[in-house]
Amino acid sequence: MTSSESTATDSPRKGLTAALESSQPRRRSFTDYRRFIQNHYDGLPGALTAVTGLLTGHEALAGRLIRPGAFDVRGCKRILDAACGNGRYSRFLLRHADADAILTTFDLSPRMLTRARARLKSERVSHAVADLTRLPYADASFDAIVCGWVLEHLPDPRLGLRELARVLQPGGKLLLLSTEDTLTGAMCSRLWHCRTYNRVELRQISAECGLRWEREMWFSGMHRLLKLGGIIVEMRRASLPDSHSA
């Protein structure tokens, strides 16, 4: 299966949430869709992520996920912020990581990387334009990874999860955030032209890719109660994924 033409293999969506979801991922080939998404984030929608993050509370809530007692990166020396966007999670990684830790970031959108550089202004960070399905890093390069709100831009999550598992060292930790197949998730899908994932199915697929769910996390107790905020989970790399698995 190639990243350019692969299609989703999970269960078909039904009902109101399916009707509300963006049709862009289904209407376009992956090559065309990837170009569309890059242009989307290079443009005004990407520039507005700083504003929308404030309005939705995601800017402040990000700090509740990346900190001691939550996704703790103390002791991690090589950290990757996958599809870093405007640097929302990078700034908390820098705040809580050891002083000698190195942060690597990438994004498909060159303009988002420019915004992240302007925001972070740190010599401890390196930036690169890269594709989650073809990461330019060696096996087991990182002991911690944050991957926020990018997996839903792939037709099949395995394309990204296998690469994340490959570059994560055995026992390394991954914080994954992804849009869920709920009503609010479908509304976000329409806004950002992405798909959604079912929580149970994504857990099973993660295991196929060598990633073991450790714990599900939430922005707040209210998010947990109302099942809001999407899928947020801390995982560990168990072993090398089988490239021939389904």
Task: Describe each PLM feature range.
Residues 146:
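A conserved beta-strand element that flanks and buttresses the S-adenosyl-L-methionine
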